[in-house]
């Protein structure tokens, strides 16, 4: 037996999709405009996971420049068939629905095969039937006319894998389980004991989120819904329950008759979510031809006992800590930037063991790829810390640490120049309006600074360490403006390292020695 702890992927890893290839499991998640896109995780026991890469790791795979933070890549699906891995997803910023493939799930993955106007809508999935034929399953607006916001339907069509093109006729097979349902989305097809099953989300990815299921003996006909639909939801538990918004599930079987579902859910703090939607695991049993999620419990559990042998990895995904160093030739797989990782914005070779971020014109309050590398926030009680060597030579130049929800809502902790002296400046950007919370002198010349942010629930304290001395710079900073409920959108916070010349020309840089996030 092995114990799995929920969430199995902490931090904003929403819209999980899972597949099994032999003894190996793989999960992918939405990434929106973060680059690289679509993180991919591997496990052999469903409890312990390692990140093996990011599927969309080249600019030509991820055209999202100029997008809002919650645009870009929506709801990927991963499937394995006949020795090849397939990932299908939607780029709502450019190109729509597309497929990439790989023989090795760690990459490299192919360039996108765009399906074009023949494949409208979002949240596509692939299904391989017993005869080897592949079918596209997606969502689209009601073709008879959208009567209300979220009036969509689920449809299928054959996909020719040689041409990567939809062929034949499409057919709507389901519109959701509840009368007047909104946003039937995230559909996945399976064939189990002679039935085609369609699992999907409905109710919108918020308080009314849920999982429903339907089935049919034939693929191209209207499906029948489970009498117990929705088969899983947390909406009846109230907004103050520790885990909310549960939905968007994908089934997997372990090869020994045991079934599981991965789904998204959110952990609020004081009624607000900083970490977005995370990946959770639940057991599935079958009764009278229908799945039962979390039998006898009816909600997501903190821990699950799984009937399998434990399998560990040297570098496992942690729910409590991330220690990032810079000795490799490429950025750590956990690090993300906004829109694109531009090679001219950073260097790992000019000073081995240090991440050099150049003070480019682009700033984090604009919708542009800037000199930023961050990791996902994973807890409400934690500290984040970085060590940085920097000397601003112009008043426009700045470097430091950022808690980032989006370009209009973030908290910056920066070293910058005032006359001939360095200053440590804490700036809150809320709905696009910037306000300096505090600024303190920080000496002269090039120095090594350690910046630490200590967060406890929705409050923060900020420390600066230099010349062997520590200073409490700011405290009692509210973090509520950087939550999804206040800032809007579909993402959670990242926190990371940043440098900018704020619209001016500059050849300066900051060298970062480490980045740490630890639960406390």
Locations of regions flagged by a protein language model:
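Carbohydrate-active catalytic/glycan-binding domains of CAZyme proteins
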Residues: 1-520
């Amino acid at each position: 037996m092995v114990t799995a702890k929920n969430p199995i992927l902490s931090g904003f890893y929403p819209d999980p999709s899972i597949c099994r290839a032999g003894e190996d499991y793989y999960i992918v998640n939405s990434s929106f405009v973060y680059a690289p896109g679509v993180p991919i995780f591997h496990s052999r026991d469903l409890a312990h996971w390692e990140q093996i890469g990011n599927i969309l790791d080249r600019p030509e795979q991820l055209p999202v420049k100029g997008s809002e933070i919650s645009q870009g890549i929506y709801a990927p699906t991963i499937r394995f068939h006949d020795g090849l891995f397939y990932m299908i997803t939607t780029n709502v910023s450019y190109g729509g629905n597309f497929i990439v493939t790989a023989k090795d799930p760690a990459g490299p993955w192919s360039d996108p095969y765009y399906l074009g106007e023949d494949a409208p809508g979002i949240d596509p999935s692939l299904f391989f039937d017993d005869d080897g034929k592949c079918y596209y399953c997606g969502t689209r607006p009601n073709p008879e006319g959208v009567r209300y916001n979220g009036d969509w339907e689920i449809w299928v069509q054959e996909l020719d894998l040689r041409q990567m093109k939809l062929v034949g006729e499409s057919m709507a097979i389901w519109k959701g389980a509840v009368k007047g349902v909104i946003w039937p989305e995230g559909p996945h097809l399976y064939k189990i004991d002679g039935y085609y099953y369609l699992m999907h989300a409905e109710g919108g990815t918020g308080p009314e989120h849920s999982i429903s299921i339907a089935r049919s003996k034939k693929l191209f006909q209207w499906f029948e819904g489970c009498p117990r639909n929705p088969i899983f939801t947390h909406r009846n538990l109230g907004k103050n329950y520790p885990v909310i918004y549960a939905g968007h599930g994908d089934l997997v079987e372990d090869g020994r008759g045991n079934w599981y579902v991965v789904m998204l859910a959110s952990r609020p703090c004081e009624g607000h979510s900083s970490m977005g939607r995370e990946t959770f695991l639940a057991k599935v049993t079958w009764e009278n031809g229908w799945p039962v999620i979390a039998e006898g419990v009816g909600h997501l559990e903190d821990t699950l006992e799984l009937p399998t042998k434990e399998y560990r990895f040297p570098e496992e995904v942690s729910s409590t800590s991330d220690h990032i160093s810079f000795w490799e030739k490429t950025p750590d797989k956990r690090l993300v930037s906004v829109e694109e990782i531009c090679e001219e914005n950073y260097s790992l070779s000019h000073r081995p063991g240090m991440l050099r971020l150049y003070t480019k014109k682009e700033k984090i309050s604009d919708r542009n790829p800037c000199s930023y590398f961050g990791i996902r926030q994973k807890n409400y009680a934690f500290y984040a810390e970085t060590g940085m060597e920097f000397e601003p030579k112009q008043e426009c130049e700045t470097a430091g640490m950022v808690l980032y929800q989006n370009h209009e809502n973030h908290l910056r902790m920066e070293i910058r120049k005032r006359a001939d002296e360095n200053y440590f400046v804490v700036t809150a950007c809320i709905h696009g309006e910037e306000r300096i919370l505090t600024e303190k002198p920080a000496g002269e010349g090039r120095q090594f600074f350690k910046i630490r942010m200590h967060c406890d629930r929705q409050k923060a304290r900020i420390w600066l360490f230099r010349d062997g001395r520590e200073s409490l710079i700011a405290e009692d900073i509210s973090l509520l403006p950087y939550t999804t409920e206040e800032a809007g959108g579909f993402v959670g916070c990242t926190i990371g390292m940043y440098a900018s010349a704020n619209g001016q020309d500059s050849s300066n840089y900051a060298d970062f020695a480490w980045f740490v996030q630890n639960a406390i």
